[in-house]
Amino acid sequence: MDISKIMEIIVKLFGSKKSEVKSNDKPPKKAQDIAKKFEKTTGKATKIWKVGDKLSPHFSYDEMTRSQTAERNSIDNTPKIENVENLIALCENVLEPVRVHFKKPATVTSGFRCIELNRKIGSTDRSQHTKGEAADFVINGSPTVTDVWKWIIDSDLDFDQVIQEFGRWIHVSYKRSGVNRHKCSIAKKVDGKTRYFHYTEEQIEKGEYEL
């Protein structure tokens, strides 16, 4: 489909060629409605969000969706509207409170991953990254990865899963629907293989875990 046809569809749907999304703002509900209409008409993931648009005060659409692997392999990692809504919920309910508490930038190393990208890096189709429900991140310097992991668990935050991975980064997830499990784990390499050790919140509170 050439660009003129695409513009005709957009004008018919929205009545204007101007974007409803303001840079640095959380996409308004009208923009989300527009995105849903665009998806329904074209069958493609929406591109209504752009670089610089905020999903929460300290986290942007760009950093939650970008991937060097996707860029190197020409993979379109554009999320669908429900994936973006999941990312917003993840930012608002977990990542933003972590950023505010530690008062240091949190670097997202992996956020949303489409199925093609997820398979490219060797992950399973069941990964919550493919739904926009999960992110891997680090806070540089102090506190340690374990400090952040433990704070999330000890806090009143609602989360589905939090994993301290190899002492290098945190994997955290949040579900908008259903019950968040509060699953707490540590990932380690044992005899060259990745193993996950699971703990209850009570065990972690008592210090009954091994790094």
Q: What do the predicted segments below correspond to?
A:
Residues 95-121:
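Extended, low-complexity, intrinsically disordered C-terminal regulatory tails
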Residues 125-146:
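Acidic, His- and aromatic-enriched active-site or binding-groove loops in soluble protein domains
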Residues 3-101, 188-211:
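Extracytoplasmic cell-surface/polysaccharide-interacting catalytic and binding patches
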Residues 109-110, 128-129, 161-165:
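Short beta-strand
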Residues 90-94, 117, 133, 144, ...:
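Amphipathic alpha-helical interface surfaces
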Residues 122-126, 187-190:
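Short, surface-exposed, charged loop/turn segments at secondary-structure junctions
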Residues 106, 135, 170:
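A broad, low-specificity signal marking well-ordered, structured residues that form hydrophobic/aromatic
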